Amino acid sequence: MAVDKLPDFISGLRFMVAAKKHLVYFYSMKESGSPTSEQIEIERQTSLLKNIVERSYLQERVSCYVLKNIPQEGLPTYNDQTHTGIEIIIIPQVHTLTKGDQNVLVRMMMASQVSRPVRLFIGMIPWDTTKESAMSGDIELALSSRITSEDWLKHKFWFACYEPDENEVFSPLIGALPESLEKAQYTDVHANRSIHRYILDVMIHLRMHKLLDTTKGGGIHTSALRDVLALSQLLALYRFNKAFVTPEHVKLACIWYFPLHVEFLKGSAMDTSVLYGSRPELVDGLLKCIADVKLSNTVETENPLFLETIVVQDVLNKVVPPV
């Protein structure tokens, strides 16, 4: 199974609005010579993303704006709880927020699910491909996630997507549904109980994977079942035009969803096998080889979560899907 890019933003945008969830948005950015030129590039990328969102929802009650600073008092809400509009809020440089700002952002995300208007957040993270090769030799840095936010903020985001190319920017969101499915909601898509068990099996295997930090459950949190199921239903309906979920839809949903959330071992001190006789220097040697593979392939595949995707695919190859 080849490793592709991260999910396309155009599909991710439609899915996040349908499911009322939040996204991480990676965009490529070359190292600049000065802070001024770097800030100009950040603002250009932010403006481009805002234009894509606004163009996609011109005829619908969806507004979009950029939130450069996190207000400590949160965002205002409407007294009218029947308000049906949606606000999409873009947060540039979400990875640079202080712990205090991250805490406020989490509270705003939680409030957005019950208050009006419904607010959906897109966290922007630049990805500098020239810095990948500079990490060679630093195992901990190389194996660290490219998403440096605290776990309790990272898990509030649904999945990570990558900036669209020019063809995607000027193409329609997703093809029209067949007439029989035009009025269908993604929650109407049927998922058999065996599908639920399949997702749980994948979660358990990820939590126990040798390359992941088992002290954190591999990064697989309790709401993963619900999140993957919703994504599977959306993929079944909008990408495959089906009214039911199959194991293939679940596999694709897992490849989209889990790379954002998994947590890697970064040294032999984190590996529980050392307690039972594994030699720390051999564990570190293995991790160095894995880090080298990650650095050599991440840029080539244009996937900042390359190694995370490999681990998810490894688990999917081992877990037997329902028949």
Swiss-Prot record:
Family note: Belongs to the MTC2 family.
Function: May be involved in telomere capping.
Protein name: Maintenance of telomere capping protein 2
Gene: MTC2
